[in-house]
């Protein structure tokens, strides 16, 4: 064993550091790509459509006039809630899938 307790000496440590830096750059690039993406969710057969970006921010909400009923506000609230929730779930799934491929299932919980 080489000095410092690292098998193979400092060469292996340098390689590990380079790999970690490369992975960090790839993850940052992937995160930027995801943040620029848009995800759509809909409810009521497309009567309500919500769009979020990869930062999970609501960027658009479209409501068809025929679903606006002043006597049934609760239905409209449910449709909006469902559409936004679906869009957010798509954003989360895409983020997890892409980052999972990049990290190779290294088990890095809480990153994304």
Curated annotation (Swiss-Prot):
GO cellular component term, pick one: bacterial nucleoid
Bias type Gly residues, positions: 102-112
GO molecular function: DNA binding
Keyword terms: Cytoplasm, DNA-binding
Disordered: annotated span: 91-112
General function of this protein: Binds to DNA and alters its conformation. May be involved in regulation of gene expression, nucleoid organization and DNA protection.
Biased composition annotated in UniProt, kind: Basic and acidic residues: 91-100
Name under which the protein is recorded: Nucleoid-associated protein CPE0046
Cellular compartment(s): Cytoplasm, Nucleoid
Coiled coil (residue ranges): none
Family that this chain belongs to: Belongs to the YbaB/EbfC family.
PANTHER family (UniProt xref): NUCLEOID-ASSOCIATED PROTEIN YBAB (PTHR33449:SF1)
Family annotation (InterPro entries): YbaB-like_sf, YbaB/EbfC
Source organism per UniProt: Clostridium perfringens (strain 13 / Type A)
Assembly and binders: Homodimer.
């Amino acid at each position: 064993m080489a000095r410092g307790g690292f098998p193979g000496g400092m060469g292996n440590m340098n390689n590990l550091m380079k790999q970690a830096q490369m992975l960090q750059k790839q993850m940052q690039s992937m995160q930027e790509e995801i943040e620029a993406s848009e995800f759509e969710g809909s409810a009521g057969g497309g009567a309500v459509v919500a769009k979020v970006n990869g930062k999970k921010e609501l960027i658009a909400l479209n409501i068809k006039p025929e679903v606006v009923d002043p006597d049934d506000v609760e239905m409209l609230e449910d449709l909006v809630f469902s559409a936004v929730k679906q869009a957010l779930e798509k954003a989360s799934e895409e983020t997890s899938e892409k980052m999972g491929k990049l990290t190779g299932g290294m088990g890095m919980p809480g990153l994304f």
